[in-house]
C-alpha cells in the first residue's frame, strides 16, 4: 500500500445561491488555507451538504472555475444534498476564507431564457456568380433548391432500389485459388 508523507488538508467549501443570478451556485471556501500554498496537482474538495445542491440533481449544469485550475464535480448516487469535487491545480495558489473557488451554472428547463422560439428553417440565401445573365431566375432557383422545392438533378434513387435482396458479391482472385 502506498503511503503519503505530505498530506494536505482537504479544501472545504459551502454552496450558496449567487446574489445576482439564481441559476448560479457559488462555492465559497470555508476555512483559512493561506498558511500553506496549494501546489500543482490534484486536491480534494469537500463540499458541505446543502439543500442548494439539490438543484444540480434536477437540472443540467456546467462548472466554472475561478482561477488557474480545473474543477470536476460528480453527483453522489444516494444523496441529493451531496457533491464530490476535485481540483486540478496548474500553479501554486493561496486560498483565503470567503474566496469563491468555483461556480456551477444551472440550466433549468423552466428558465425563461431557454423558452425562446427556435427557428428550425435555415435562412434563405442567394448565390450569385459573375457569369449570371438572368440573376433573378437563378436566385429563385437557388432558393427553391435550398427549400427543397426542386428535384435533385442527375440522381435516380429508384434505380438503386431492388427487391430487398443483397447484391451478389464480386469475385476476387483469391476465390479461385486452391488452398492446401
Swiss-Prot record:
Additional comment: Shares some antigenic similarities to the smooth muscle protein telokin, but is not similar at the sequence level.
Region entry Disordered, spans: 112-180
Annotated organism of origin: Autographa californica nuclear polyhedrosis virus
CDD domains membership: TLP-20 (cd00235)
Gene that encodes the chain: TLP20
Organism classification: Viruses, Viruses incertae sedis, Naldaviricetes, Lefavirales, Baculoviridae
Biased composition, class Acidic residues, residue ranges: 156-165
Name of the protein in its database record: Telokin-like protein 20
Top-rank lineage group of the source organism: Viruses
Amino acid at each position: 500500500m502506498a503511503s503519503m508523507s505530505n498530506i494536505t488538508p482537504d479544501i472545504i467549501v459551502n454552496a450558496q445561491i449567487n446574489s445576482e443570478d439564481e441559476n448560479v451556485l457559488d462555492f465559497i471556501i470555508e476555512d483559512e488555507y493561506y498558511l500553506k500554498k496549494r501546489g500543482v496537482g490534484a486536491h480534494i474538495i469537500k463540499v458541505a451538504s446543502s439543500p442548494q445542491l439539490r438543484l444540480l440533481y434536477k437540472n443540467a449544469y456546467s462548472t466554472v472555475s475561478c482561477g488557474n485550475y480545473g474543477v470536476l464535480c460528480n453527483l453522489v448516487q444516494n444523496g441529493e444534498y451531496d457533491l464530490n469535487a476535485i481540483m486540478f491545480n496548474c500553479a501554486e495558489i493561496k486560498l483565503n476564507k470567503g474566496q469563491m473557488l468555483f461556480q456551477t451554472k444551472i440550466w433549468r428547463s423552466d428558465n425563461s431564457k431557454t423558452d425562446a422560439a427556435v427557428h428550425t428553417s435555415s435562412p434563405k440565401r442567394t448565390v450569385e456568380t459573375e457569369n449570371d445573365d438572368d440573376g433573378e431566375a437563378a436566385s429563385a432557383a437557388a432558393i427553391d433548391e435550398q427549400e427543397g422545392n426542386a428535384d435533385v438533378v442527375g440522381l435516380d434513387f429508384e434505380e438503386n432500389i431492388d427487391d430487398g435482396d443483397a447484391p451478389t458479391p464480386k469475385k476476387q482472385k483469391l476465390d479461385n485459388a486452391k488452398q492446401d
